[in-house]
Amino acid sequence: MSSGNPGGALRALSPTPPERGSFPLDHDGECAEYMQKYLQCMRLAANENAHNCRLLAKDYLKCRMDHQLMDKDEWKNLGLPPDDKQ
């Protein structure tokens, strides 16, 4: 029985890294509250791209950036609205 590859040869798959690289997990739960609010919003919105959920996602990502759990980036690069000018 063949393995499905031409010639029956096994090839090593080379994984592709994520676009933004790896980032540390929030082991200390520093941003857990923001994450829970976002996930609850997504459940209520039936996983639709709701504006208020996007703002909660922004809060969560800001928390991750503030605690060095991800690299800082501009909101437009993350598909989120810019901060309001005050």
UniProtKB/Swiss-Prot annotation:
Residues 28-71 form the CHCH domain. PROSITE patterns: CHCH. A motif (Cx9C motif 1) lies at residues 31-41. It is found in: Cytoplasm; Mitochondrion intermembrane space. A motif (Cx9C motif 2) lies at residues 53-63. One of its GO terms (cellular component) is mitochondrial intermembrane space. One of its GO terms (biological process) is mitochondrial cytochrome c oxidase assembly. The keyword Magnesium does not apply. Belongs to the COX19 family. This is Cytochrome c oxidase assembly protein COX19.
